[in-house]
Amino acid sequence: MSSEFAATWLPAVFVPLIGLVTPAVFIVLIGRYITATD
């Protein structure tokens, strides 16, 4: 794998991945917090 390939390919994968995973993790943490304090 060349560095040029990684430079074009990694952001294209990680940006949407982070955009989907971050809210999902946030929701899970809130859900656990709510159930733990309930």
From Swiss-Prot:
<dbReference type="InterPro" id="IPR001302">
    <property type="entry name" value="PSI_PsaI"/>
</dbReference>
<keyword id="KW-0793">Thylakoid</keyword>
<dbReference type="InterPro" id="IPR036357">
    <property type="entry name" value="PSI_PsaI_sf"/>
</dbReference>
<keyword id="KW-0812">Transmembrane</keyword>
<keyword id="KW-0472">Membrane</keyword>
<keyword id="KW-0603">Photosystem I</keyword>
<dbReference type="Pfam" id="PF00796">
    <property type="entry name" value="PSI_8"/>
</dbReference>
<protein>
    <recommendedName>
        <fullName>Photosystem I reaction center subunit VIII</fullName>
    </recommendedName>
</protein>
<dbReference type="GO" id="GO:0031676">
    <property type="term" value="C:plasma membrane-derived thylakoid membrane"/>
</dbReference>
<dbReference type="GO" id="GO:0009522">
    <property type="term" value="C:photosystem I"/>
</dbReference>
<comment type="function">
    <text>May help in the organization of the PsaL subunit.</text>
</comment>
<keyword id="KW-0602">Photosynthesis</keyword>
<feature type="transmembrane region" description="Helical">
    <location>
        <begin position="12"/>
        <end position="32"/>
    </location>
</feature>
<keyword id="KW-1133">Transmembrane helix</keyword>
<comment type="similarity">
    <text>Belongs to the PsaI family.</text>
</comment>
<dbReference type="GO" id="GO:0015979">
    <property type="term" value="P:photosynthesis"/>
</dbReference>
